[in-house]
Amino acid sequence: MPFGLKLRRTRRYNVLSKNCFVTRIRLLDSNVIECTLSVESTGQECLEAVAQRLELRETHYFGLWFLSKSQQARWVELEKPLKKHLDKFANEPLLFFGVMFYVPNVSWLQQEATRYQYYLQVKKDVLEGRLRCTLDQVIRLAGLAVQADFGDYNQFDSQDFLREYVLFPMDLALEEAVLEELTQKVAQEHKAHSGILPAEAELMYINEVERLDGFGQEIFPVKDNHGNCVHLGIFFMGIFVRNRIGRQAVIYRWNDMGNITHNKSTILVELINKEETALFHTDDIENAKYISRLFATRHKFYKQNKICTEQSNSPPPIRRQPTWSRSSLPRQQPYILPPVHVQCGEHYSETHTSQDSIFHGNEEALYCNSHNSLDLNYLNGTVTNGSVCSVHSVNSLNCSQSFIQASPVSSNLSIPGSDIMRADYIPSHRHSAIIVPSYRPTPDYETVMRQMKRGILHTDSQSQSLRNLNIINTHAYNQPEDLVYSQPEMRERHPYTVPYGPQGVYSNKLVSPSDQRNPKNNVVPSKPGASAISHTVSTPELANMQLQGSHNYSTAHMLKNYLFRPPPPYPRPRPATSTPDLASHRHKYVSGSSPDLVTRKVQLSVKTFQEDSSPVVHQSLQEVSEPLTATKHHGTVNKRHSLEVMNSMVRGMEAMTLKSLHLPMARRNTLREQGPPEEGSGSHEVPQLPQYHHKKTFSDATMLIHSSESEEEEEEAPESVPQIPMLREKMEYSAQLQAALARIPNKPPPEYPGPRKSVSNGALRQDQASLPPAMARARVLRHGPAKAISMSRTDPPAVNGASLGPSISEPDLTSVKERVKKEPVKERPVSEMFSLEDSIIEREMMIRNLEKQKMAGLEAQKRPLMLAALNGLSVARVSGREENRVDATRVPMDERFRTLKKKLEEGMVFTEYEQIPKKKANGIFSTAALPENAERSRIREVVPYEENRVELIPTKENNTGYINASHIKVVVGGAEWHYIATQGPLPHTCHDFWQMVWEQGVNVIAMVTAEEEGGRTKSHRYWPKLGSKHSSATYGKFKVTTKFRTDSVCYATTGLKVKHLLSGQERTVWHLQYTDWPDHGCPEDVQGFLSYLEEIQSVRRHTNSMLEGTKNRHPPIVVHCSAGVGRTGVLILSELMIYCLEHNEKVEVPMMLRLLREQRMFMIQTIAQYKFVYQVLIQFLQNSRLI
């Protein structure tokens, strides 16, 4: 080259490093933390990071400040980019966290965490010499500080540690002897405070400091309009002016001031009453700008919140007592300002208008309850004098209400304390337009029984529409009186944690920490009859199962720790085989404790989703085994089949099923490949099944089979062909359809190109374990009290699928057929048979569409068969009515079974339901009644009570932290159950929903509704569809990614990854959606709902096992439907009552519903839903007795 240039290619321009910077923040306890931010990050985001570390919610009292290049304290302008602000004004990128807005009394501070940080700030003010105090005051304050930081006097052998502890202000120059004498006096003061809780000592310390000269003041040197040098100060009552010798000249109250501005280097304070302007001059323009904006911010904050803005008659000062507790702390207390002695004690009323302060991202004074029981961070270490930073007398001045959410795993959840209920929250007018018509008067019991005997009252459908929301006093919270509550002890459980014990006594006693156990691990000894365990089809692998850890547990130990559900009943007569007779079982549903354990497998997507979650991610399908052929053959069974083959089979099966519905339930035949049904007895031999093993963590509803996916396994079919009993009537099918189905090839169809391990939800594939073709799952479809179909797989053909795999798209199961028909044939792989016989199948589908209009009365019977056919299963044999009928005389019904059934049959539940109050008599709805929160509720009459509502960390968009959700806590038999009952998210509240899930540490979401029902939106879809772009969506500060979805007959299980964008933390959330609830009424298939409850319990146990060793070991489960009261109440009440049945607790359904409604109004909206709970309990008892 002519130019001797050598270009270095080793250096890279790191864009990420150029866009980020690290800032240090010194906390009030002198610890320093680091925060990595982008160059565009504002001071607000940095403050949120600090709030996350401190688990702080009431950030509107706090702020960040720095030392300027002239060593003056300056507050950060939170709305501006932090890096640019620090580069321009700061001496170094070091921030200080502190209190910005002081209050006249500590009772303004609602949270314990807020009070602790406030205590650290005022103690720092004392030790740094900002407040003038006498030696007696110093000793008294030092004694309280030692009690607050170290505890009682008798915990230490000697008081020598006090010599290393900073006790006195830094500017107090003391000789060694005097210092020793004062230290001994502090030790005596410490001993006098023995027995006072640290939190109480902190409050007493703050109370003492409030009376010191200079408390909460910030002073700037200026010149008045006459050129005299004065001190211009600001505090929580207003602005004051002092001369250089400290004499008070004048004080301007907040109500006396209008605008506060600046003109060049002059500060202008407009006085309203005097119609004049006070002028103060500074050295430069920047200083005048800073002071004027600071004063304007303080003025706006205090005036909007009515803190010390009006004169009021305050009660006399409260005398300090040794047993003084925080709950007895007065809400109003005078503040004495030396030497003026101005009293200020009036409480504020909250306002909710936005503020455009340069210092605050959002500085509304909103006081919210804490959901975290925050332990105080005591100063147990050694602090030297040099560790306390000495700064200008600046007291923190920042207000923000959005936070980086703390990791729920590390948070200590508890019930929020009572808010101070203010009259300002009460709406001034009634919204008459939203009040529904009054509830229909309830007839007396005799009238009801008389109508029932006459056949007038239909127990299944009576008053379903009329028994909807009974909202006759929806505005009971519009009361004119002021409601003031004292702050409760935040370390204790709160009164609405309701115990539910066997004695039937329901009181609001507090729950001790020892009682706060996982309901699933809290085993209550039961009666001998209840503890007898029989190995049935639900336990085919227990002998070879290995639990968590390295222990080998016996079956009894395993059941003791995990509280297994009793499996569904054996059929009658009992099978003779020793292994589970899967081919002849007639379970109504195959759920987590049913014989489908040996056919479940671990999906590839589950492994990538979460290694520890594989025991729960499963193919929990309730399937019906319906083989179409029964000839002897030795064929290789391929695991994977094309979507076209299976969906074409579905279309043929629907046509066949449609015609079969014309016949009586027990008289349906199966379409055989050759000839009519053979005559013979109903008994047959079934080959035994091989054993399968796995060593992953298991639960009663989630057994999985680990098998290789690297090779196709072959197994010969058994030689024996079971005989099918002769039925009285034969079903006739189209000859063309029979011919088409008979020509189904035995060889597997061509596979899809590309990855072989991921198919859509509509595609089915064989299990990934080596299974004989005769192996299958069984179930019974319940269509009525005395009607049932027994279905089993006896000799499956080569095309019978087994289960659903993880999908790349998320179609509804009922729409697979329509989707396949709409897609062009050339775009889908098709098998040979169906490409030839497509016209025949389509002709049958046309016939089906014509006959569909005649089948409206049988819709409830047809739907389960259609879903079973869509799962790739077919009817193999149908036993007669004699076999299917459950002999009630053989069921060992106990007293509870008879009592529940009697109530249901005699209609006693109707009167029982009507006598339960719809909601709490004196419920408070302060936050929910605010105008800005009206649009956050789906139904404005259904809102949470104030004392147990879920409180979010306030943000700019939601400055009250409101969401229509309630904590539901009930203690049953010593075990605490914790739910969050909430409404289905609205389009504009999805980010609030995910914020709640994150902050409350939720790992399981139970959704008891579809997104749309009957053309109406029930719940906005708040999670991304599988197969959408990256399967991810962002909701506010959270990114949600769908990892997999598994559909069963009546519910769908979805695995989600939730990432907090600000902190980068991720968490797994399980989404369980019940999909079988009809548009009106309740599910007809009670056993299906029971299987859904078992699925929830299984996932709960798994997620809780992942939280061992953390503070939040038992997070709540979010349950929601549309309004969050009807179906949500059914699920919660059913699960609680089943737990009572399992542990021989007294079953009081109306009493439990009453307790639930005291925590969330209108739980269980209709009598039909209430009756359905009884049906669920009866079915559960029936299952448990048919072992």
From Swiss-Prot:
Consequence recorded when altering residue 159 to E:
In a breast cancer sample; somatic mutation
Superkingdom field: Eukaryota
Q: Name one GO molecular function term.
A: receptor tyrosine kinase binding
Give tissue specificity per the record.
Ubiquitous.
Output the Pfam families linked to this UniProt entry: FERM_C (PF09380), FERM_M (PF00373), FERM_N (PF09379), Y_phosphatase (PF00102)
Q: Domain Tyrosine-protein phosphatase: where?
A: 909-1180
Give the Phosphoserine positions (modified residues). Answer: 314, 461, 486, 591, 593-594, 642, 831
Q: Does the keyword Acyltransferase apply?
A: no
Tell me what PTMs the record reports for this protein: Ubiquitinated by the ECS (Elongin BC-CUL2/5-SOCS-box protein)/LRR1 E3 ligase complex and subsequently targeted to proteasomal degradation.
Tell me what turns on expression of this protein: Up-regulated at protein level by cell density. However, at the mRNA level remains the same regardless of the status of cell density.
Annotated localization: Cytoplasm; Cytoplasm, Cytoskeleton; Nucleus
Q: Which Gene3D superfamilies match?
A: 1.20.80.10, Phosphatidylinositol 3-kinase Catalytic Subunit, Chain A, domain 1, Pleckstrin-homology domain (PH domain)/Phosphotyrosine-binding domain (PTB), Protein tyrosine phosphatase superfamily
Q: Where along the chain is substrate bound?
A: 1079, 1121-1127, 1165
Cite the SMART domains for this sequence: B41 (SM00295), FERM_C (SM01196), PTPc (SM00194), PTPc_motif (SM00404)
Kindly state which reaction or reactions the protein catalyses.
O-phospho-L-tyrosyl-[protein] + H2O = L-tyrosyl-[protein] + phosphate
The record's function comment reads: Protein tyrosine phosphatase which may play a role in the regulation of lymphangiogenesis, cell-cell adhesion, cell-matrix adhesion, cell migration, cell growth and also regulates TGF-beta gene expression, thereby modulating epithelial-mesenchymal transition. Mediates beta-catenin dephosphorylation at adhesion junctions. Acts as a negative regulator of the oncogenic property of YAP, a downstream target of the hippo pathway, in a cell density-dependent manner. May function as a tumor suppressor.
Family named by the database record: Belongs to the protein-tyrosine phosphatase family. Non-receptor class subfamily.
Q: Name the chain's protein.
A: Tyrosine-protein phosphatase non-receptor type 14
State the organism of origin. Homo sapiens
